[in-house]
Every structure is written in structure tokens, then in C-alpha cells.
Amino acid sequence: MTHYGVSSKLLLYPQHTTHTNMSNTEATEALYLHDASLRDLTTEVISSQSITSLSEEEQSLAKNVPAEDSVVTMRETIFYAQGGGQPSDTGAIGSDQPATFEVTLVRKTPDGRYLHFGKYNNVPFAMGQKVVQKIDDSKRNYHSQLHTAGHIVGLAMQLLMPEKKKVKANHFPREASMEYEGLLYNEDKPTIQEKVDELVRQDLAILISWVEGEEGEEGRSHDGRTRIASIGGLDHNPCGGTHVPRTGLVGSIIIRKISRQKGISRVSYDVSPGIEG
């Protein structure tokens, strides 16, 4: 993992309380939705607080985060929040003061606030303080490759077997898969692999657009618009995830296996090269 100059030795400080009014529910502007190429951003801290001071609902978003960690919200963010089958970004937040925050998880609340969970290696940020966000570039690129690869597998299935309805997508490393109603078998792997390879070779553009109204929870922004991802105009999927600009940039997609359970078939895939073993 890239640490952006953050010391791996994290210093312990007394747990802090909120630096702003807890009733503040200002939605975070998620800039990655409009420009996924951003890797650093200067913004302003809205709150910095201990995890234990969050509501029970908000604490449930960070089940595997140590209780002694902290959470920071800011006016804007380039950090992708876990959801839509994709893990969150990680990285660091720094300032011109001796305060750095290492981000280990980002989650979005129902009211549109992005909670950046992690650890300080110095004194906490103050409300209104200017800070610089830096995301782990290699991890973002890998997650974007996996997510775009999932859409490519989905388009291949749509072109080959349009009668198969997609029921679930998972773009996590080592778990990436697409699930469909009905039965598929390992004998179908070569056909799916061939179509996937063809779509990668065509180097089709990944097109992002916004439509008014609600086409499903995935891809919806807090203002009610829906973000649509399309591969060369051949498909249109509500999607809030990050993507590479073109299919040719995913690397090689490997259809690993096809499995079945209770009438649902899972097409497991990976991309190569990746950064996470």
C-alpha cells in the first residue's frame, strides 16, 4: 500500500471528541463521480471525531474498524466509498500542520455524508482546517480495472445469452464475480472468455452520463440523479463505481470458473496484472 509519506508508526493520542456540531448533515460532494482521474484534492474539514461518538447506525458502517480509530468528514472527497460491489479507496489526508490521517475505510451515510475512517499520527484536524487528500493510486487503478472488467463480463453475457438475468455483482479482489439466474457450466467458459477478449481488444470507451429520476439505488446521487456507465454505447448500467477510461486498459480478464447454487450461476473472474495477491 502506498503511504504518501505517512509514517507506518502511528502515535497514540488521547481520544478526541467531535470538533463540530453533530447535527451537521451537509452532504459531501463526491468529485470522483465526475472525474475519476483525480488523485489529490485540497478541501476543508467539516468534522473530526472518535468513532464511539457516532450514532449506532453510523458505527455499524465500520464493523471491522478499531473502536479507538477516528472519523473525518470534509466538504468534498475524491475517496470512493465502499458500495456497489467495490471496496473503498484508502490513502492519506495531510495539512500544513503536523497532522496526518491515514484512511483505511470510507463509507457513505444515507444522507450523503462520506465518513473517512482511520488513524491520526498526530493531533486531530480542526473544523474548517484546509487539508489535502491523497488516494492510494495503485489500489484505485486495480479496483477500477476489476469494476470495468465486471461490466465487460456483463456485456459479454448480455450479447451471448440475453435471456440470463444478472442478479448480483461483486468487484472485490479475489472475490470478483457476476451472478445470473439459470444454469451455466464450465463448458460455457471458452465462449464467454472469447467474447470478453474481443471486447477488450476493441478498446471501447467507458462512457459516463447522468439521467434525471431513479433507475435503481446503485448509481444514484443524493440529488436524485442516476449515474450511468456504458461500454461503447452497447449497454447502460446504473453505477456509482470507478472505471478505467477504455476496455483496453483493464489488462487481461480471466474467467476463472463457473459455479452453481440453487438455480443461480456465478461467473468468477480476475484481471491480470493486479496489485493485490
For every predicted segment, state its role.
Residues 5, 10-277:
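Active-/binding-site microenvironments in catalytic and ligand-binding cores
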